[in-house]
Amino acid sequence: MLQDRVSGSLSSSKISRCVLFLSLFCFFLLTMHASANRLQRVPNPGPSPAPEPKPCPSPGPNPAPATTKRTHNTTFPAIFAFGDSILDTGNNDYILTLIKANFLPYGMNFPDKVPTGRFCNGKIPSDFIADYIGVKPVVPAYLRPGLTQEDLLTGVSFASGGSGYDPLTPIVVSAIPMSKQLTYFQEYIEKVKGFVGKEKAEHIISKGLAIVVAGSDDLANTYYGEHLEEFLYDIDTYTSFMASSAASFAMQLYESGAKKIGFIGVSPIGCIPIQRTTRGGLKRKCADELNFAAQLFNSKLSTSLNELAKTMKNTTLVYIDIYSSFNDMIQNPKKYGFDEIDRGCCGTGLLELGPLCNKYTSLLCKNVSSFMFWDSYHPTERAYKILSQKFVENDMGPFYDN
């Protein structure tokens, strides 16, 4: 049994390294192509950041049912997003990392087909949630140059693709650590104070909605992917460490003035296309080991946050289950209008992610709205829309009570 486990782990690790090598190679080709294009153009003062997408209906012949409508907002003056690629609206565009999505076909369903750094074909949960609760149609990345006062006052995303609760996770891929995201948040608060004064700034921070999504990269990449922590911890100990780190982050948000804080758990990561490919065998089944780890972490995260919430005054701190909704979509795809749930729309859909999903080497599926996954790791805009609707309809109640 131990020999089989080690053999399987080494095999998965080799595949992961192969994917990383291909990503580096494709990134090099994309960089060379972009450099060649720049040499052929008239010089300009410097690249301008891509404009934020304008609000528009979700594309495709089979849009998700619009059961959730944007309402006039009298409760949340702003939204703040922290964590990984699920909520990253473009921060990775402005740091030195390979984990980027600022090129087509990412963003292909935004107006003018502008890729903004979101790891999706369109909007992501931070955008949908902000829109549904009446804050604004899209959430800009904090590191994006040229943010207006209005952009900042209504909230931004500090999230970074590839980050996690384990400090080692962002180091491996050069993402923004959770600790640095918190530093940016505190820096942001000072900017807001400069705009509207201390009292108004404290109101915005305390009444704004803070959403945190992380943990998937810790489990899928740091622990099981590269086995960087597997030799030091068993999965029970590691998930306890993750939950403790998450609770510490929650406390620091609270101490910074946030009073409405939601932590979204980890989805069934064993069922995402790349894990089916690398760990699911010839039949590409879900990787039960990863799904078990996700559920174990979610249980500990929920318990940790519930205990911590008892110590916080006038604060709503809640755990939000995403595993059940995500799993229901996988188990009952027709219920949600999906035809494909085990591969992504980009390329073969088996391994493509980041630089491997590009307009030069990757063909796209004919009907993206029928796919649950955009690349081998991230859901499509339509899948995100459905999940965000469920969140707003089922989990927002406690935030309105405070």
Swiss-Prot record:
GO terms for molecular function: lipase activity. Coiled coil: none annotated. InterPro entries: GDSL, GDSL_lipolytic_enzyme, Lipase_GDSL_AS, SGNH_hydro_sf, SGNH_plant_lipase-like. GO terms for cellular component: extracellular region. Its EC number is 3.1.1.-. SUPFAM superfamilies: SGNH hydrolase. This is GDSL esterase/lipase At1g20120.
